[in-house]
Amino acid sequence: MGKTLFDKLWNRHVIYGKEGEPQLLYVDLHLIHEVTSPQAFEGLRLENRPLRRPDKTFATMDHNVPTEDIFNIQDLVAKKQIEALQTNCAEFGVTLADMGSDRQGIVHMVGPETGLTQPGKVIVCGDSHTATHGAFGAIGFGIGSSEVEHVFATQTIWQQKPKSMGIEINGKLPKGVYAKDIILHLIATYGVAFGTGYAVEYYGETIRNMSMEERMTICNMAIEGGAKMGMMAPDETTFEYVRGREYAPTDMDKAISDWKTLQTDSDAEYDLHIKMDASILEPYVTWGTNPEMGVPFSKAFPEIKDMNYERAYEYMGLKPGQTAEQIELGYVFIGSCTNARLSDLEEAARIVKGNKVKNNIRALVVPGSRQVRNAAESIGLDKIFIEAGFEWREPGCSMCLGMNPDQVPDGVHCASTSNRNFEGRQGKGARTHLVSPAMAAAAAINGHFIDIRKVAVISGGN
């Protein structure tokens, strides 16, 4: 029987262990940031251990970065964590994309942008959205602080092999429907736990026609569907994205020859298989307190089916039967490791250009990295957003999570391009609605959600 992409990647990295038991995997790339690394570095010091492979470790600042003034850190814990990463990287010889550096940004954007993220690798990070890197034909998953220390010390990690799931996505995306809507649809349809215990491979005509940025959006939110990791087979789109980047292989022809073998064999079988038709999708909006609680734009919010729904409606200040258009928005956030890449900002700018943010809305655009910010400014996107009334910020995780000054006030509804809508995720009492960048941009200039498919300047589809 043939092998799946996941099988091939996993088998390449097993150092020790029997099938059905935890196995020791070699780690090709360890990405770190300021929040989950201090304890791990301190553990090395206490045991007087060196960091085994500083050349396979890369650090950046993202979670705690103040995006209005990156060097004005008021929170003492955040300041201490950032200073600790600077000290630790200097002491242990780790390359750091520091505050203000041209390489600084959200860790899951910096890896791909620098060419560190490549097909065939096992990539770990002390952050759950490490699944993003699977878009390159890699294994990427988040780890805890004790596991970060283990990787520091050994460049390996113990893991139980997940089962395999194949999600086949075919059909042309309709105008106004994006990669974000695909993953929101999957989670709304199958639930936040459907991927538990699985490594998910997304494939099919729709995936093949996507850019790397779109692919990263889908893999980024594999974790929201419960999966251990998400991945896609590498192809010419992947190879051209990696080519010429700072850490790309010196012999690209040789690398590509190997990467082309990273495909699921025609006679391979997944443990679970799902088929999806992308051509019938609509823009999605979440109404509740987990990503499963979402609906196509044309549908009303569902009836209460259990205590979780009842609690979600109470927290969100909404009722069954209402529609997305009726949500009283106060904030719009375009950013996060899900949707803060250049193509996301370009699509949002197309909608915003020549319009003004409504008076009831405070709108932020936070590029996911310094590279994206510089590229956006080089083509004038910053001016479009600023003239429309958006705040144009420095790169960082920003309003995706309530760990920095960018937070949504208590009881306020926010249209957000991020990945999680849990209670308090964007600040105490914040009410988060997950959408695509186009939907968020349109909400900002209309003062509420609208059917993005009726906007003339949008693209979407593939």
From Swiss-Prot:
EC number, UniProt record: 4.2.1.33
Function: Catalyzes the isomerization between 2-isopropylmalate and 3-isopropylmalate, via the formation of 2-isopropylmaleate.
Matches recorded under PANTHER family: 3-ISOPROPYLMALATE DEHYDRATASE, HOMOACONITASE, MITOCHONDRIAL-RELATED
Pathway: Amino-acid biosynthesis; L-leucine biosynthesis; L-leucine from 3-methyl-2-oxobutanoate: step 2/4
Gene Ontology biological-process annotations: L-leucine biosynthetic process
Gene3D superfamilies: Aconitase, domain 3 (3.30.499.10)
Top-level taxon of origin: Bacteria
Necessary cofactors: [4Fe-4S] cluster
Reaction catalysed by this enzyme: (2R,3S)-3-isopropylmalate = (2S)-2-isopropylmalate
Positions that bind [4Fe-4S] cluster: C337, C397, C400
Pfam families tied to this protein: Aconitase (PF00330)
Keywords assigned by UniProt, alphabetized: 4Fe-4S, Amino-acid biosynthesis, Branched-chain amino acid biosynthesis, Iron, Iron-sulfur, Leucine biosynthesis, Lyase, Metal-binding
InterPro entries in alphabetical order: 3-IsopropMal_deHydase_lsu (IPR004430), Acnase/IPM_dHydase_lsu_aba_1/3 (IPR015931), Acoase/IPM_deHydtase_lsu_aba (IPR001030), Aconitase_4Fe-4S_BS (IPR018136), Aconitase_4Fe-4S_dom (IPR036008), IPM_dehydratase_rel_enz (IPR050067), IPMI_cat (IPR033941)
GO MF annotation: an example: metal ion binding
Cofactor binding description: Binds 1 [4Fe-4S] cluster per subunit.
Name the record gives this protein: 3-isopropylmalate dehydratase large subunit
Record-stated family: Belongs to the aconitase/IPM isomerase family. LeuC type 1 subfamily.
Species of origin: Listeria monocytogenes serovar 1/2a (strain ATCC BAA-679 / EGD-e)
Complexes and interactors: Heterodimer of LeuC and LeuD.
